Amino acid sequence: MNEKTARQIAEMKNQTIGVEVEMNSITRQRAAKVAAAYFGTGRYENTAGRNGYSTWSAWDADGREWKFQKDVSIAGPDEQKCELVTPILTYGDIETLQELCRQLRHNGAKSDASRGCGVHIHIGAQGHTPQSLRNLANIMASHESLIAEALKLDRSRMSRYCRTVDPRFLEQVNRRKPRSMAHLADIWYTSNGASYGRSHHYNDSRYHMLNLHATFTKGTVEFRLFQFDEPTAERRGGIHAGQLKSYIQLCLALSQMAKDVRTASPKPQQNENPKYAMRTWLLRLGFIGEEFATARDFLTRNLTGDTAFRHGRAAA
């Protein structure tokens, strides 16, 4: 690994993280109790009066509040519509989050697109500028189809809750080249037809794979596109700790790349060999070595093609 890549990975890991995992088949009270037991604090309580959303909360040993909230978009009985909302995390907290998700799964929690469940990942917007966020929009636009294929994204979710970058936003942001966050916000909301209620949580502009509404209202860059695999004859599907870590690493890397590059193009990647395209892109993102082996596997396993040869292997 060269010095530039090592620095890229180190800076990537310095970003803050927030994660939302939607699930059902477990009540919010039960999920909070499981979390409190795992944290070793035993502290959990109903915090709906303060947090709304029929919330139950659990606290870890550092006094951080982990929330389990009701989200009406989740399928199933109301008492089992459960969304885990983490406190602000660092890279070193990922293993804690992974083990908590394992504990929730062992206690019956289920999550996949057929249940109306997704995974949303927030990366702290510190260090981002109008130019870096423009870069990020272009990076996403050029890779969204590849990512959707790699993750087998549910098409109904893509049409409603995690749409691709709006072409009107893409055209305007690249033509007008905003130099201030206020100007970027104006372009974001007007091009998405959502100038009303900019401060409202449920502003319609949020329903994109890349959600900059969160940037302007919460100080984070939100990636809303993720989901766990649905069960098959070969796999159990559902909540998977390794898959979750892979998603977090990808979001961190995307955010860092947007900061590092001078400009980025929205032109779609080659698609004659998707597996090769994904592998080479992941290497540019810094996914090198054993630490990123699981992510490389999850992000290429569903793609067709050859990871080693762009135009396929020569016949013997």
Regions found by a protein language model. Name each.
Residues 1-113, 126-316:
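C-terminal accessory/tail domains of diverse enzymes
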